[in-house]
């Protein structure tokens, strides 16, 4: 069993929890979901998920509660993180917005709500490195990755813009993988990814 922590300030917490459980089941791994709203929870988690929502509000809570430094320590220990939409903004090296205190756990620069300036939401099939078939990605006022540094690997692009990246054991997407029954992004981040340490924390049932 693994313990999966989900930052539960905003965003689709229950949908992410269901996707993590489905991904674990595909590997015969049971998952306990814990919601993160205060410090002291992250150190006990094997994997972490930072969902969407309003990035300024989420980053303020992480800073105020001291959760930000716990997440950074989690990453330094080589433990997996999946950050989606606003989570990508918070995880980035630079969000180009002084209102957002970024975690600097993935080597990218992000433009907030870039797709939302033209269209509020859309779905597109994405070719994602590590997945055999296109992933049905749902974009909702999504950020754009302006630049990926040398430590970040681009996993998927949409109209020449990176929309999924990986930096060590951290995977981040501009889209919402939880808004589809397809749990392959959660699987890629937490179970199928050979660059993380989740395998040392699990036992099969």
From Swiss-Prot:
Catalytic activity, reaction form: aldehydo-D-ribose 5-phosphate + D-glyceraldehyde 3-phosphate + L-glutamine = pyridoxal 5'-phosphate + L-glutamate + phosphate + 3 H2O + H(+); L-glutamine + H2O = L-glutamate + NH4(+)
Organism of derivation: Haloquadratum walsbyi (strain DSM 16790 / HBSQ001)
Subunit structure: In the presence of PdxS, forms a dodecamer of heterodimers. Only shows activity in the heterodimer.
Single GO MF descriptor: glutaminase activity
SUPFAM superfamilies associated with the record: Class I glutamine amidotransferase-like
EC number: 4.3.3.6, 3.5.1.2
GO cellular component, one term: cytosol
Residues annotated to bind L-glutamine: 53-55, 112, 140-141
GO biological process, one term: pyridoxal phosphate biosynthetic process
Gene that specifies this protein: pdxT
A Pfam cross-reference name: SNO
Family: Belongs to the glutaminase PdxT/SNO family.
Highest taxon of source: Archaea
Active-site residues, Swiss-Prot/TrEMBL: 85, 176, 178
Full protein name: Pyridoxal 5'-phosphate synthase subunit PdxT
InterPro entries (UniProt xref): Class_I_gatase-like (IPR029062), PdxT/SNO (IPR002161), PdxT/SNO_CS (IPR021196)
């Amino acid at each position: 069993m693994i313990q999966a922590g989900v930052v539960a300030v905003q965003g689709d917490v229950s949908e992410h929890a269901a996707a993590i459980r489905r991904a674990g089941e595909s590997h015969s791994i049971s998952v306990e979901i814990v919601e993160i709203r205060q410090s002291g929870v992250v150190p006990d988690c094997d994997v972490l998920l930072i969902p969407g929502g309003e990035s300024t509000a989420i980053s303020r809570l992480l800073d105020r509660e001291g959760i930000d430094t716990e997440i950074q320590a989690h990453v330094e220990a080589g433990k997996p993180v999946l950050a989606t939409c606003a989570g990508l903004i918070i995880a980035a090296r630079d969000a180009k917005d002084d209102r957002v205190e970024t975690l600097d756990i993935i080597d990218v620069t992000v433009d907030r709500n870039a797709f939302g300036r033209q269209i509020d939401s859309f779905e597109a099939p994405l070719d994602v490195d590590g997945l055999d078939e296109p992933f049905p990605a749902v974009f909702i006022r999504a950020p754009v990755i302006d630049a990926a540094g040398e430590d970040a690997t681009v996993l998927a692009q949409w109209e020449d813009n990176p929309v999924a990246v990986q930096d060590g054991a951290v995977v981040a997407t501009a889209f919402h993988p939880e808004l589809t029954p397809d749990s392959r992004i959660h699987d890629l981040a937490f179970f199928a990814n050979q660059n993380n340490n989740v395998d040392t924390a699990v036992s099969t049932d």
